[in-house]
């Protein structure tokens, strides 16, 4: 996949703290200002110049912007987790380290668990992140499984059940009320009907581990 989206990274210098903006590739998305400001505030840098940030994002060029005084603490690689409203997906985005350490699989699983993600974790998608370490990019690290609806029980009849009460019409236009075709002729041993039991379907689950039941079906005795 590679790094297509624009992203940002802290740069800690002797005299001040900067945020470095990396431009998007041709097919990539620019930085979302809300995502950037939330990241800065989360790391104790609320005194940024919003207009300067917006102008830098719109230029889509590599640049550094001062966002605060010296910030001596190292920043580790981190991940945000957003669980969809229906809890069927957990979308994660990663942010690069600044002098700190990168995340490993155990830390990713820990952060997913901390956000209530207990089921449907996609190990292959986690490995995909490690291959490219694409930042400010959506990775669907967990998916729920939709239930499979079943079918009602049914009876299949092996004789004519479509009773037609219309009298037989003769060639001369008259009708014969004695021929109503309401009787099916059978012999001993003929299979008259077969009961097909209900199919209850297959249960699903969301990423929070909650069971999702299929639609209720009708049974027959």
Description of each model-found segment:
Residues 1-221:
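Long, low-complexity, mixed-charge
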